[in-house]
């Protein structure tokens, strides 16, 4: 597998092989591929250190910024110290965080339920962007149980537009087959069509490219993602993968072989670092889950080198983004408190109530008008407190909005 030599390149290029069938019309109009289809549809329808034990308390909530449907006045036009780190139009949430609300029966509860009511509530909180985690909701909600269709996407788009929200991505269908079966390829294209109707710039998955630790398997994953990325690129969509902690562990790429002929030692490169090197930067993108990246920082700080020596290498999530900034258009922004018992270093909590230093992370990463942080908290839904997830979504929004640049 030959590495791509320009991992920072972000231009789409003019390679005819990457062009779609509507290029002549699109170019005559002077608009991008994604915006072309999206507009037609609308008209028709952390830090460097290991876990920060004893870190600063939670950010104070700033609740004076919400007006109407979240169109707050953040006065974030300043420069340097004190600058808002995440502009209002970049503040998003993955709907997995409030999955209990979208799945709630509107006939059995007065709380917001189904996509339409949840969109309304999130807009009131101040959010401007959402990332989908599939298109299913309760069957009694407007539109029915599944909106995973062209018609369903048009309905979702109308609700997003009603509440001033923008769809920025989806954790959805990535074919399991490789080489791609005809059926998987058609299903993938259907999801790209849905993404375009919804106005998304990005489409991806909540899973790692592979769960393997071996270079050969990551080479196969890179081939697959390069092909899927080219298909998505032709439809004007940036295809992205999402990480958990294991993907930032060390790649096994040398040393003695085990009894199955597989390498047992590492050169010190992390799996997703290698993936960045061997995927095409024009067509494959990443969403860093900052919580899981910090778990990886806690768990994977030594490796056995090819010569058998033990070497230390602390993971720097922000540093990796800085070196590959345009490859990371999306983040999952979720927080954690220190745990000494769960083996991960952190327990998830609402954003801004934990110890992960997001002020430093976003200050180092910069490019605030490019990155799209999506609030996520796996633990927000509660079996005993049905209002909790949307309530915590508000807490998380306020803390994200309160972040100011560190010099």
Residue positions per predicted region:
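Active-site acidic/histidine proton-transfer and metal-coordination neighborhood
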Residues: 41-42, 51, 175-285, 295
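N-terminal secretory signal peptides
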Residues: 1-31
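Short, acidic/polar
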Residues: 105-122, 181-193, 313-320, 358
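N-terminal export signals
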Residues: 19, 23-30, 35-57
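Catalytic domains of carbohydrate-active enzymes, especially glycoside hydrolases
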Residues: 113-135, 198-199
């Amino acid at each position: 597998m030959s590495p791509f030599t320009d991992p920072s390149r972000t231009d789409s290029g003019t390679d005819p092989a990457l062009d779609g069938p509507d290029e002549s019309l699109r170019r005559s109009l002077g608009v991008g591929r994604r915006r072309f289809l999206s507009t037609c549809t609308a008209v028709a329808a952390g830090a460097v250190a290991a876990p920060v034990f004893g870190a600063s308390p939670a950010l104070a909530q700033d609740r004076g910024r919400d007006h109407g449907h979240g169109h707050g006045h953040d006065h974030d036009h300043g420069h340097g110290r004190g600058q808002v780190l995440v502009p209002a139009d970049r503040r998003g949430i993955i709907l997995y965080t409030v999955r209990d609300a979208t799945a709630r029966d509107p006939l059995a509860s007065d709380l917001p339920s189904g996509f339409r009511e949840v969109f309304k509530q999130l807009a009131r909180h101040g959010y401007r962007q959402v990332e989908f985690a599939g298109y299913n909701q309760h069957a009694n909600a407007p539109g029915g149980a599944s909106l995973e269709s062209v018609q369903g996407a048009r309905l979702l788009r109308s609700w997003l537009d009603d509440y001033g929200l923008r769809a920025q991505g989806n954790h959805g269908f990535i074919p399991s087959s490789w080489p791609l079966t005809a059926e998987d390829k058609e299903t993938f294209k259907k999801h790209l069509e849905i993404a375009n109707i919804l106005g998304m710039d990005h489409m991806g998955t909540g899973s790692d490219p592979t769960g393997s630790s071996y270079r050969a398997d990551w080479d196969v994953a890179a081939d697959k993602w390069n092909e899927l990325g080219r298909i998505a690129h032709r439809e004007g969509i940036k295809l992205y993968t999402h990480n958990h902690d294991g993907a930032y562990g060390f790649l096994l790429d040398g040393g003695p072989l085990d009894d199955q002929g597989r390498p047992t030692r590492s050169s010190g490169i992390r799996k997703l670092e290698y993936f960045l090197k061997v995927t095409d930067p024009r067509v494959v993108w990443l969403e860093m889950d900052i919580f899981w990246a910090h778990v990886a920082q806690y768990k994977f700080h030594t490796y056995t080198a090819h010569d058998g020596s033990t070497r230390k290498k602390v993971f720097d999530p922000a540093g990796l983004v800085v070196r590959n900034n345009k490859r990371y258009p999306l983040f999952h922004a979720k927080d954690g408190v220190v745990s000494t018992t769960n083996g991960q270093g952190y327990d998830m909590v609402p954003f801004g109530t934990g110890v992960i230093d997001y002020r430093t992370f976003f200050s180092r990463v910069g490019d605030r008008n490019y990155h799209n942080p999506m609030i996520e908290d796996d633990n927000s839904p509660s079996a005993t407190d049905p209002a909790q997830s949307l309530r915590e979504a508000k807490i998380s929004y306020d803390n994200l909005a309160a972040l100011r640049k560190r010099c």
